[in-house]
């Protein structure tokens, strides 16, 4: 059974909390287990917590959960691109899969709500599939 870590942004907790619950359910359905969850204030802080989990020998991969809503500036775009690049870099550096379960940028609250199930499932599925490849 694959042992996964999960990092959850608590910003927009009404959305990310539900995404987190659904991700845990999806992992069980897939025959994997989320063994450690780290909550962080916002999506910007996700990469540091991911690194902490990747350094643990008993963690096979990491699921990330967050949502970045559209604001009045391009801040959401800048943050989303920086996070995606850093997560990809960490995955390659540690040789363990890291998912991008962060909805956004450039989405509204309503759009984020509609994506809860899909993004939570994809976040788990991508890590599990990478661990089971070959």
Predicted regions: what they are:
Residues 79-104, 122:
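Short, acidic/small-residue loops that bind anionic groups at enzyme active sites
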């Amino acid at each position: 059974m694959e042992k996964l870590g999960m990092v959850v942004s608590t910003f927009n907790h009404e959305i990310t909390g539900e995404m987190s619950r659904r991700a845990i359910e999806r992992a069980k359905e897939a025959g994997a287990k989320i063994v450690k969850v780290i909550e962080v204030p916002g999506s910007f802080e996700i990469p540091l917590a991911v690194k902490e989990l990747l350094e643990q020998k008993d963690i096979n991969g990491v699921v990330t959960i967050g949502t970045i809503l559209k604001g009045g500036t391009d801040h959401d775009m800048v943050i989303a691109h920086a996070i995606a690049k850093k997560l990809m870099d960490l995955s390659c550096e540690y040789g363990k899969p890291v998912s991008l379960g962060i909805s956004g940028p450039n989405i509204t609250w309503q759009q984020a709500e509609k994506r809860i199930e899909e993004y939570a499932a994809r976040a788990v599925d991508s890590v599990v599939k990478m661990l089971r490849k070959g």
